[in-house]
């Protein structure tokens, strides 16, 4: 394996780590006792699904060295994650 591939696999791992952190920080919003409207909860669920699909949908681009953007987080939450 050449260094380029190894480096890009490390970058892919970093994308996974950020994605996992975003998922973890949105867990509370889907709990049944969290004070949020049903509409906003559905938006969060869609956002979380987009995050789960993010790596599969962008793996080739990431491994090719392209910059890809994470799904846009809903405007009513602030996850305080810098990536």
Locate predicted features.
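A preference for well-ordered globular domain cores
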Residues: 1-83
């Amino acid at each position: 394996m050449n260094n380029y591939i190894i480096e890009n696999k490390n970058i892919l791992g970093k994308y996974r780590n950020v994605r996992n952190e975003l998922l973890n920080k949105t867990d509370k919003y889907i709990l049944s006792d969290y004070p949020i409207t049903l509409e906003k909860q559905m938006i969060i669920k869609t956002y979380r699904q987009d995050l789960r699909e993010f790596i599969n949908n962008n793996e080739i681009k990431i491994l090719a060295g392209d910059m890809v953007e994470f799904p846009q987080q809903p405007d009513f939450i602030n996850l305080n994650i810098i990536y």
